[in-house]
């Protein structure tokens, strides 16, 4: 029997129904399994009822359904007595469908029905579409058919508390939302429209196991490095998830130093969410919407890797979970102190062979003077700028090799209690013993944030 009395979440029987009571404070309503990808071949109905004399107000905070012309495929339908039903599908920026954006739905009576349909498919799991997250609330019904939200005592305009689905998301700005005369929910302190739920970074569900041999590589367990990306452009490379839509990587994986085609990259393929290459390929490529390479990167200068950093914006947000979580950005120089230990993970060459499993190594931040002396002894001409740092020990095995480029070096931030990507695998002198040289992410944090937060006239590669 799939008739359930719930207070906010649809469960996952193939066809199901729920009756929800709208109250003074907003409650969450999500698609089955949100924020994990929803399963094909199911249908859910939620009838939301308000007390006598009140209406139902519904606002979507997140919406990500598979797009289709006219929303004939997967869809959410909003219906209320006396009005035409509204069918929604797609996601932000979709060229197909009709996503709700920040639309507000208010019932004409005291009830509203939401129907979620995911059509049957040979592939039971959709293409990593996570469904929806909505807030519903009772609102005072007015004679003219309008509605006003319950007023928090002493609050003018009306206010509600913002909530996000943990543990993978948190409120961008904790506190209260208000509904002024514009009838759009805004952050009371900053005056912005409904704040987004932002991903929690740097906190894997599965702790990283200590490597008893200290040096050398170990096989990663699922969830150890949930930010790890596998890229395929001019060959295999790596990267790290930032937020739920961006990949941090090295510029030279996109525009290689030895390429005869300057500033012309091939198709960029990004795979996420597993520690096995074969399984990653089965999960499918995440299409890239935009490639942004740092302006200081000089592809034609073979001995200068300054500015070796790039960002890949994915077409769609990815559903976060134990195997797919973002890493954090650094915010202070103490994370680069000599002797501080960190981890590097990747799918690079090991003992001359390409690996199909994610490996990781524990390596220390090296003294800058030691790395400079090491380069001089070998008469190397590569630029070692202040935007770089080095990792490893001169006489110990350095397991980083071809195929690891773009992957990140992470250290534990004792103050913030999270893993931070301080470096990006950039260049080295062969594989084996010695030091590896990394892009210093701290030097580029302002640039990274500027690109990610850009809304107009954004830079392209």
Curated annotation (Swiss-Prot):
Keywords: Complement pathway, Disulfide bond, Glycoprotein, Hydrolase, Immunity, Innate immunity, Protease, Secreted, Serine protease, Signal, Sushi. GO terms for cellular component: blood microparticle; extracellular space. Residues 23-139 form the CUB domain. It holds the Pfam family Trypsin. It is found in: Secreted. GO terms for molecular function: serine-type endopeptidase activity. This is Complement C1r subcomponent-like protein. It comes from Rattus norvegicus. The lineage of its organism: Eukaryota, Metazoa, Chordata, Craniata, Vertebrata.
């Amino acid at each position: 029997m799939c008739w359930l009395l719930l207070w906010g979440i649809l469960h996952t029987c193939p066809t199901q129904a729920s009756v929800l009571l709208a109250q003074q404070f907003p409650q969450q309503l999500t698609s089955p399994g949100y924020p994990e990808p929803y399963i094909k071949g199911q249908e859910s109905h939620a009838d939301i009822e308000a007390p006598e004399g009140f209406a139902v107000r519904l606002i979507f905070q997140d919406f990500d359904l598979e797009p289709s012309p006219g929303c004939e495929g997967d869809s959410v339908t909003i219906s209320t007595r006396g009005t035409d039903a509204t069918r929604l599908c797609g996601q932000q920026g979709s060229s197909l469908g009709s996503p709700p954006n920040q639309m507000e739905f208010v019932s004409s009576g005291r009830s509203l029905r939401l129907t979620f349909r995911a059509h049957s498919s040979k592939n039971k799991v959709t293409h990593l579409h996570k469904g929806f997250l909505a807030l519903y609330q009772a609102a005072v019904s007015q004679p003219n058919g309008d509605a006003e939200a319950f007023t928090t005592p002493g609050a003018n305009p009306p206010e509600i508390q913002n909530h996000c689905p943990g543990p993978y998301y948190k409120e961008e700005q904790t506190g209260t939302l208000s509904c002024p005369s514009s009838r759009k929910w805004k952050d009371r302190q900053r005056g912005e429209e409904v704040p987004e739920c932002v991903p929690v970074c740097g906190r894997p569900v599965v702790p990283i196991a200590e490597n008893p041999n200290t040096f050398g590589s170990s096989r990663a367990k699922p969830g150890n490095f949930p930010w790890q990306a596998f890229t395929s452009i001019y060959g295999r490379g790596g990267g790290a998830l930032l937020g739920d839509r961006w990949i941090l990587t090295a510029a030279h994986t996109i525009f290689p130093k030895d390429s005869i085609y300057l500033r012309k990259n091939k198709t960029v393929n990004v795979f996420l969410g597993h520690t096995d290459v074969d399984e990653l390929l089965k999960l499918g490529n995440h299409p890239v919407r935009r490639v942004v390479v740092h302006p200081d990167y000089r592809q034609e200068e073979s001995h200068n890797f300054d500015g070796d950093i790039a960002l890949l914006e994915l077409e769609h947000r990815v559903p976060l979970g134990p195997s797919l979580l973002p890493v954090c950005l650094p915010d202070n120089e103490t994370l680069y102190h000599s002797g501080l230990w960190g981890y590097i993970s990747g799918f690079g060459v090991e003992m001359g062979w390409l690996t199909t499993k994610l490996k990781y190594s524990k390596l220390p931040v090296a003294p800058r003077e030691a790395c400079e002396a090491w380069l001089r002894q070998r008469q190397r001409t590569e630029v070692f700028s202040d935007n770089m740092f080095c990792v490893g020990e001169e006489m110990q095995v350095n397991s980083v090799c071809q195929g690891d480029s773009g992957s990140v070096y992470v250290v534990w931030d004792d103050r913030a209690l999270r893993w931070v990507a301080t470096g990006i695998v950039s260049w080295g002198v062969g594989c084996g013993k010695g030091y590896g040289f990394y892009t210093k992410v701290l030097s580029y944090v302002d640039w990274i944030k500027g690109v990610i937060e850009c809304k107009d006239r954004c830079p392209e590669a």
